[in-house]
Amino acid sequence: MINKYTKIMSIILATLLLSGCTSSIGNDNDLEKDNGKIKIVASFYTMYDIANKIGGDKVSIKTMVPSGTEPHDWEPSSKDIKDLQKADLFLYNGAGMEPWAEKILSSIDNKKLVIVEASSGINLIENQAKDENLKNDPHVWLNPLLFEKQMEVVKDALVNIDPSNKEYYEKNFRENSAKVHKLDKEYKDSVSKFNKKDIVVSHAAFGYLCNAYGLNQIAIEGINADSEPSPGRMAEITKFVKDNNIKYIFFEELISPKVANTIAKETGAKTEVLNPIEGLKEEDVKNGKEYFTVMRDNLEVLKKALQD
């Protein structure tokens, strides 16, 4: 009896361990095994999060860009293209965020595939750095109200694909829309209390966030995450930090903090993470991190930086 019990417990534990090894943001999902669910391929984490929030248990999501990877310069593999051949919906941000998307979509032979560009219909911020190949800033989701618009685009697509579950998708959208407006109010109430409005960031990813709440981003590097600041730009930022009593230099987890650390060392400022939510680490997702929690983390570090 004891041996039988031990064997049963061993099987249960093994099952739990195996399930714990499965990617929680869909990098390892096998779309062929998800019978009855809408099969979604999401380009990177933020698109996964939107699809998950609206689709819930009615969808199976495969995320293309691996966990913790910077999506700007990632390139798809032949396996990713095969996944698109099996998918019902391909969700990508657009606006230049995934420069590889148009190239691979032209090679896909999947007549049922619905292609959804989440930034479609949104007024984009023009990229002021003329030496970069990006026409616009693609980081629209950092304005919560634009994130809501992206969720609505996905909701409408899922309703069209799967009208029998219309009420389910609309309910999920309403619930997350309420969370968006609560978050938006928290940002407005908090930021309005500070006279200081300038933030120094390593990467010009926060234009939509700043426009939404009256902030001004001073970017060391351009919208392209792999751009390099010139010595002149470094000197200009260093002077600005000193002249304006900037206490924090923001950097991103997926990009080297070397430049931010250099300026912080020269000016006496501190460094802190401001997350553009392009690609969360697997560990963070397993610990409950998602769009709303990370945006609140961002608000807390912004409040520290804006104090006089």
Language model features by range: what are they?
Residues 1-3:
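N-terminal secretory signal peptides that target proteins for export/translocation
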Residues 5, 10, 20-308:
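Extracytoplasmic metal-acquisition and chelation regions
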Residues 14-15:
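Residue-level signal for mature regions of secreted extracellular proteins and peptides
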